[in-house]
């Protein structure tokens, strides 16, 4: 059989009689991947739900902790937000904090379509993103995500308490996203540090 264990960091480890012994001529990689008592590090973070099922939620290197020591999985939250067509991009903050906050980029096509159907006039992305009705639209998405997270005892503390609809789209040309549209957290933390602090 296979044994599974969750470390305090949230990383999932497993071991079984069929696990490889070591990497060929690479003791460093073996030491990084296997513990001295034969557990294999998956690099994934997860937990066992109430029914005993293993749930993988993020890469272990990306998971942090809120000040109450509960798990904070930014990509998990961001993907839940981006499920809504009105949200193009989301960046969540909470590691070492008392609660979770988020930056949100609206999806211009989806929100412009919504604006047209709801007689909301705008002349630019900035104007649309700043519209109070658009804020309410995004707040509805955030509240739905929070309700979903609240149902999960393990992640309930990661509900998004505050958010900001950014006035500009995060852009690979500005170094805020990679070319494959992955968030560059370090750059965003540096560039928007004042806005991040204002959310807390």
Segments (PLM) and residue ranges:
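C-terminal boundary motif of the adenylate-forming
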Residues: 45, 84-110, 149-152
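Short Gly/Ser/Thr- and Asp/Glu-enriched loop/turn motifs at secondary-structure junctions
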Residues: 59, 95-99, 157-161
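Conserved ATP-binding/catalytic segment of the ANL
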Residues: 5-66
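Conserved C-terminal "lid"/linker of ANL adenylate-forming enzymes
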Residues: 89, 139, 145-200
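Phosphate/diphosphate-binding loops
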Residues: 1-4, 76
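Residue-level signal for inorganic ion chemistry
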Residues: 4, 52, 81, 102
């Amino acid at each position: 059989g296979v044994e599974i264990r969750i470390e305090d960091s949230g990383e999932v480890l497993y071991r079984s009689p069929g696990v490889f012994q070591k990497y060929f001529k690479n003791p460093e990689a073996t030491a990084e991947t296997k513990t001295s008592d034969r557990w294999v590090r998956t690099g994934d973070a997860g937990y066992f739900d109430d029914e005993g099922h293993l749930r993988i939620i993020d890469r272990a290197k990306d998971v942090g902790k809120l000040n109450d020591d509960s798990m904070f999985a930014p990509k998990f939250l961001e993907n839940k937000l981006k499920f809504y067509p009105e949200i193009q991009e989301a960046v969540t903050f909470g590691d070492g904090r008392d609660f979770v906050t988020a930056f949100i980029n609206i999806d211009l096509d989806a929100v412009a379509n919504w604006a047209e159907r709801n007689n909301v006039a705008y002349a630019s992305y900035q104007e649309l993103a700043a519209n109070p009705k658009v804020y309410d639209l995004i707040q509805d998405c955030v509240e739905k995500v929070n309700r979903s997270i609240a149902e999960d005892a393990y992640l309930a503390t990661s509900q998004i308490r505050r958010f900001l609809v950014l006035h500009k789209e995060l852009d690979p040309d500005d170094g805020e996203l990679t070319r494959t549209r992955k968030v560059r957290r370090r750059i965003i933390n540096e560039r928007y540090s004042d806005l991040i602090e204002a959310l807390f």
